Amino acid sequence: MFTKWKEKFAAKKATDHAVDESRKWKKNALFQDCLHAMRGSCTVAPMDLHEAAIAAVNIAIREGTWAELSGVSEDLFSGMVYLVWGEATLPVLRAPWAVAVENLKRIRIVDPNAFIVAETMDKILWFSVHDRISLYNIT
């Protein structure tokens, strides 16, 4: 009986923490700018995908392997992508590839250090301060 109560308490605590984090993001002006840049066509990624996207970006940065994006087919990035912001405390957002591409300039204005991670988690687009788009290949 004590174990069930303990599990129930732990689940409630985790839920309360998620709600608190959500409230904190809603008050964050930069996060509101991020949402505005995506014109509301995105959702906050689940925690497991959030962690996978952050890990993919960290690997790409550490390995430093990249190639220019020229000639890359849009088909390569069809589906959903994850926006990883330069501000580590902001949640990863999930959005359709077409919406992310359509709003590139707005994303750069909000956070020039933002990354976009493809659904497959093996390709990362990086939007740099100098308006250059690079393709990271971490496979």
Set out the residue ranges of the language-model regions.
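Structured alpha/beta or helical-core interaction and ligand-binding surfaces enriched in interleaved
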Residues: M1-R132, Y136-T139
